[in-house]
Amino acid sequence: MAKISKRMKSVKGLVDKQKVYALDEAIKLAKETSTTKFDSTVELSFNLNIDPRKADQQIRGALVLPAGTGKTQKVLVLTNTKVKEAQDAGADFVGGEELITKIQKENWFEFDVIVATPEMMAKLGAIGKVLGPKGLMPNPKTGTVTMDVAKAIDEIKKGKIEFRADKEGNIHTIIGKASFTAEQLKENFTTILNEMKRVKPQTVKGDYIINITISTTMGPGIKVEIN
């Protein structure tokens, strides 16, 4: 069993696992319990009262975090029709079938997000089994299958994130870095919470959000009040 460092033990003692914290206190604790030497990611988990087996309760979407993510996203645009627009908008890689082949044959993944124009989707099917598990398959619901590649690139570079409920009804996402100010983290948290409420399936009965947990990379989970 891996040894728990003195620092890890001390920060775990700061968090009462049974307590549900007000947002301001939860964010303060998350920053205080960041134990990594690098700038930890601040993560958010929603446990939702949904049944993802039902088509009308499969939650998926995307939004731009107002304070950004703290990470520079590399964008690959797959297109035959919007090459210049993609290049002018600041895409890191732009191409067509030759880049699909590169992914397929060379296991090339030097990018974080794929944006594709509609005519490329049939060709992308050849590597769907590779992209799917990595969460890289473009999808109209998240705005990554589009003719407006400039808008898609701009949003991603500004801090767009995607979210999707897993088979247990949980959504895992991020709200920034431990180096962010408390106000930046609060602003991003509120934006995500409002979006979660907006996409609530109409068929859900009773409480929709069961609990929310905030944590940093390798840090303890902190339960947050739902308002």
UniProtKB/Swiss-Prot annotation:
MF term (GO), any: tRNA binding
Superkingdom, natural source: Bacteria
Family annotation (CDD domains): Ribosomal_L1 (cd00403)
SUPFAM superfamilies, per database record: Ribosomal protein L1 (SSF56808)
GO biological process: regulation of translation; translation
KW Nucleus (keyword) present: no
PROSITE patterns linked to this entry: RIBOSOMAL_L1
GO cellular component, one term: large ribosomal subunit
Manganese is among the record's keywords: no
Keywords: Repressor, Ribonucleoprotein, Ribosomal protein, RNA-binding, rRNA-binding, Translation regulation, tRNA-binding
Protein family per UniProt: Belongs to the universal ribosomal protein uL1 family.
PANTHER family: 54S RIBOSOMAL PROTEIN L1, MITOCHONDRIAL, LARGE RIBOSOMAL SUBUNIT PROTEIN UL1M
Subunit structure: Part of the 50S ribosomal subunit.
Role: Binds directly to 23S rRNA. The L1 stalk is quite mobile in the ribosome, and is involved in E site tRNA release.
Protein name, as recorded: Large ribosomal subunit protein uL1
Source species taxonomy: Bacteria, Bacillati, Mycoplasmatota, Mollicutes, Entomoplasmatales
